[in-house]
Curated annotation (Swiss-Prot):
Reactions that this protein is recorded to catalyse: AMP + diphosphate = 5-phospho-alpha-D-ribose 1-diphosphate + adenine
Domain of life: Bacteria
Function: Catalyzes a salvage reaction resulting in the formation of AMP, that is energically less costly than de novo synthesis.
Subcellular location: Cytoplasm
Name of the molecule in the record: Adenine phosphoribosyltransferase
Gene name of the encoded protein: apt
Length: 172
């Protein structure tokens, strides 16, 4: 299936000059959503995933159904203050400032093979922070899968050395 046909592009949103790639149109089409998640599941299986990690919120949209189908755990990666127990945290840079991501301190066991799933790869900052926490806990990032990759924003280069699958790619 050609997944790109199910993505709606919204010009000048959330701000002028941005062409937003809206995955909700793909999610609203049952067969397209299922086939895209199935493609990420196939990838995670080939990578030997013991657990799936996904950044909030749209990483949950692809990561949770993948973990469920594979009968393995899902690790939510959340913004600071959203997880109730002890966490590890990584501060990372945004275009205008900084943010913090966290995961529970016992979410990844040493030696576990983790596949990170998310909706979109742009600059790679969120995924880079996620990788740091996984590796800090002793996990191995076995692969990273995305619905969409925006070429030309440096994300793939920032994640050099990691196996990456993108179902849809947009040139800059």
């Amino acid at each position: 299936m050609e997944f790109k046909q199910h993505i709606k592009e919204v010009e000048n949103w959330p701000k002028e000059g941005i062409s937003f790639k809206d995955i909700t149109s793909l999610m609203q089409n049952g067969p397209a959503y299922k086939q895209s998640v199935d493609a990420l599941i196939d990838y995670a299986r080939k990578q030997g995933a013991d657990v799936i990690a996904g950044p909030e919120a749209r990483g949950f949209v692809v990561g949770c159904p993948a973990a469920y189908a594979m009968e393995i755990g899902f690790v939510p990666v959340r913004k600071e203050g959203k997880l109730p127990r002890e966490t590890v945290r990584v501060e990372y840079g945004l275009e205008y400032g900084k943010d913090v991501l966290t995961m529970h301190h016992d979410a990844i066991q040493p030696g576990q093979r983790v596949v990170i799933l998310d909706d979109l790869l742009a600059t790679g900052g969120t995924i880079e922070a996620t990788i740091k926490m996984i590796e800090q806990l002793g996990g191995t990032v076995a692969g990273i899968g995305f619905l969409i990759e925006l070429d030309g924003l440096g994300g793939r280069e920032k994640l050099e050395g990691y196996d990456i699958l993108s179902l849809i790619r947009y040139a800059d």
